Each structure stands twice: as C-alpha cells, then as structure tokens.
Amino acid sequence: MRAVEWRGAPIDDDFVEIIETCVQCRGCEPACPSGVPFGRLIEGTREALARERTITPRWQRWAFAMLPRHRTLLAGSTMLALAQRLRLAPRRLGVGRLPLRRGPAVTPTGSDVWLFTGCVMDAWQRDTHRNTARVLDAIGVTYAVPGSSGSCCGALHTHAGLRDEAVELALGVMASMPGEAPILVNSAGCGAALKDYGHLLGTDGARRFAARVFDVHEWIAPRLDAVPDLRPLGEPVIVQDPCHLRHVQKAHLPVRAVVGRFAEVIELDDEGLCCGAGGAYSALQPELAGEIRERKVATIERAYERSGATVVVSANPGCSMHLQQALAARGIDVRHPIDLLAAALP
C-alpha cells in the first residue's frame, strides 16, 4: 500500500479488488501486535487510486457531492423514502427504511456545548438529535447547532479517497463551530472523522478542534447523576458496537454506562465483529456486506436466545439501518442508545 501511495507502484486488478473489498472497519488494528495503522494506510492507498480514477465511480462522486447540500439531501431522502414505500427502490442500495417525515430540526438553546447534526444523520435519524437535545435539557446543559456550512463531516469522502473534498468539508465544519465549547456527536462515523481532523489537516488549529470532540455517550455518561430518576426499561438491551466507536474512538464503554442506568446490558460474544455497513460499503459491495451482516445477526440471535432481549442499540446510523433490514423480520428492533435514554427520562 505504501508503494502505491508514495512511489507510484503499478496497480493491477487484483490489488484494486483487495482494496475495494475492504470494509474499512479497522478491526485489524487492535488485533495487530505491531500496531500497524491499517486505517490510514487504506485511506492513503484509496486516495492514490482515486487520483488514477481506478476507484470511486462517477455516480458515487455525484452522490457524495450531494451530502453537503443539505436541502438537496433532505429532498432526495424524502423521494427515496417514497420510492421505498412504492417498492421502486432497489434493495441493493443497502439503505434501510427511511422516514417520510422527519419533524423539526433541533432549536439551539445556548452555548454550553455544540451538537453536531451532520448530513445523513439529520436527514435519516433526526429523532435522535431531538432526543439528544431532550437529554441535554434534562442534565441542564444548553446547546448550539452548527450552520449549513458544517453539515457534512467528510467521513465518506475520506473513506473513498477523495481527500481534497474531505479537507474542504472539514474546514467548513471547523468554521461552523468556533470557540472552546465541547462538540458532541451522536454518530460514531462522524465522531471518528471529527476527531481525526488533526491528522487530516495537519494544523494546530485542527488538533485543538479535534480535542474538543466527544462521542455523546462519553460526555453524557459521567453527568447522568443530574437525572437520578430514570425509568427502568423493563427488558434487557443488546449492545452492538459500531466499528468507528470501538476500534477508532475507543469510546464504546460509555454506551454501556449510559444504557446500564435503565436496563440490563447484554453483551455479544463476537469481540466487536463488523456488521458490514461500512459507510457506503453496503451499497458498493452488497453481497459481501450481506455476508458480513449475517455473521453479526447470528451473534445477535445467540444473545437473544440467552437473554430474551428484543432490542439492540447501535450508535451509528449506517450500522443500525443495515442491521434493521435483517432483524426486523426476526422481531428484533434496532435503536440508538440515546433514543432509549430519552424514553427513560422522568
């Protein structure tokens, strides 16, 4: 990979296939005894391949270009949701059932923290933003929301090798959330991207910005004593760790601390096995993504057999929607941990 990225080594079809079929879950990093940063190696290699137009087809570039155009994304998402209801949307897109109505956006209440709303998360799971706001209200924290220039973190662009586009989006995100207030993110993929801006941009300002970023659970968990009377859920909850929360941010334990305040936590026995969503991977490699998902579903079913739990929590929109496609028919619901926490508020 370094030879391709740095020295322009020849690229053949076999090499491209290897890179294209990597889900970029980064599960190899904690397993590697030498600590090789495979994630950054893959990103650098994909950047070199993208420059050669060997990967990242034109339709994918077009789709990614729509992400920062928030109104266009919202309109397109509504059209896709309607197409799903009419059975006109191909399942190979790898997109779970989208909401026809998403309700109002979060209204800022102050400036204690920033709540990063993102692009896909706001278009497809806006309820989770409103529930995050409810939790912050209960804790007694005010929040600001970035403007439209900070609506896309660039994570998918980075994964696709589109570094120039990712840098441009990162600069917009940083400009949209100035100051020193903490930045809370309720999407694991977005949080990992924002925390990596120091590496992406290589500036002191970007490193200071990245140091302000927290996954919402790691920030909320030590502050939940401010809400002492949470209502018990009444059933156990299976926790599924998004790869970018567990392997990249290493912030998966606070999810258990949050969920454990109102429900019994049920662990999976797969040591953080990827679910196969991988950002855009489920759309680009639907067969492989489906095979990976079936392995994950098998571990969830084992947890269900042990505990009777019919609720799975996952703190990333891609993971939750990808899993819900397979688990809905089995009577298992996939939710965001913050949604359950909001339901437990007194």
Where are these predicted regions, by residue range?
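N-terminal cysteine/histidine-rich coordination modules
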Residues: 1-17
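Iron-sulfur cluster-binding electron-transfer modules in prokaryotic oxidoreductases
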Residues: 38-346
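Cysteine-centered iron-sulfur cluster-binding motifs in ferredoxin-type domains/subunits
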Residues: 12, 16-36, 272-273
